Amino acid sequence: MGRDTIADIITYIRNADMDKKGTVRIPSTNITENIVKILLREGFIENVRKHRENNKDFLVLTLRHRRNRKRAYRNILKRISRPGLRIYSNSQRIPRISGGIGVVILSTSRGIMTDREARLERIGGEILFYIW
């Protein structure tokens, strides 16, 4: 795990998706737990469970599968703001992904939330990544 935990989460999920694995294990931190809750609520993953091994906590994510197929859905995840170049947006300029089908994950003063929640509360923040 590197210094950019959000990029690591995206990479873990993307690699598991490309390898056609049903589950992926990621290290558990406050940021990863908040992001995983949003992904679960938005329907991009099926299930989450906590796992403890050698005094380290992990989250085991079950990726969403298509009916009657063993392959997972192809989720496109794209990191936007990164440690070397932070990208911020106010509530009016939060981008819409694929006409509202995709989700923008933001870090705001009120925690990590989706673009829809941020628009409703009329707050902006750092654009972490897109998923669609």
Curated annotation (Swiss-Prot):
<keyword id="KW-0689">Ribosomal protein</keyword>
<comment type="subunit">
    <text>Part of the 30S ribosomal subunit.</text>
</comment>
<dbReference type="InterPro" id="IPR035987">
    <property type="entry name" value="Ribosomal_uS8_sf"/>
</dbReference>
<keyword id="KW-0699">rRNA-binding</keyword>
<keyword id="KW-0934">Plastid</keyword>
<dbReference type="Pfam" id="PF00410">
    <property type="entry name" value="Ribosomal_S8"/>
</dbReference>
<dbReference type="InterPro" id="IPR000630">
    <property type="entry name" value="Ribosomal_uS8"/>
</dbReference>
<keyword id="KW-0687">Ribonucleoprotein</keyword>
<dbReference type="GO" id="GO:0009507">
    <property type="term" value="C:chloroplast"/>
</dbReference>
<comment type="similarity">
    <text>Belongs to the universal ribosomal protein uS8 family.</text>
</comment>
<keyword id="KW-0694">RNA-binding</keyword>
<comment type="function">
    <text>One of the primary rRNA binding proteins, it binds directly to 16S rRNA central domain where it helps coordinate assembly of the platform of the 30S subunit.</text>
</comment>
<dbReference type="GO" id="GO:0005840">
    <property type="term" value="C:ribosome"/>
</dbReference>
<protein>
    <recommendedName>
        <fullName>Small ribosomal subunit protein uS8c</fullName>
    </recommendedName>
</protein>
<dbReference type="GO" id="GO:0006412">
    <property type="term" value="P:translation"/>
</dbReference>
<dbReference type="GO" id="GO:0003735">
    <property type="term" value="F:structural constituent of ribosome"/>
</dbReference>
<dbReference type="GO" id="GO:1990904">
    <property type="term" value="C:ribonucleoprotein complex"/>
</dbReference>
<dbReference type="GO" id="GO:0019843">
    <property type="term" value="F:rRNA binding"/>
</dbReference>
<dbReference type="InterPro" id="IPR047863">
    <property type="entry name" value="Ribosomal_uS8_CS"/>
</dbReference>
<keyword id="KW-0150">Chloroplast</keyword>
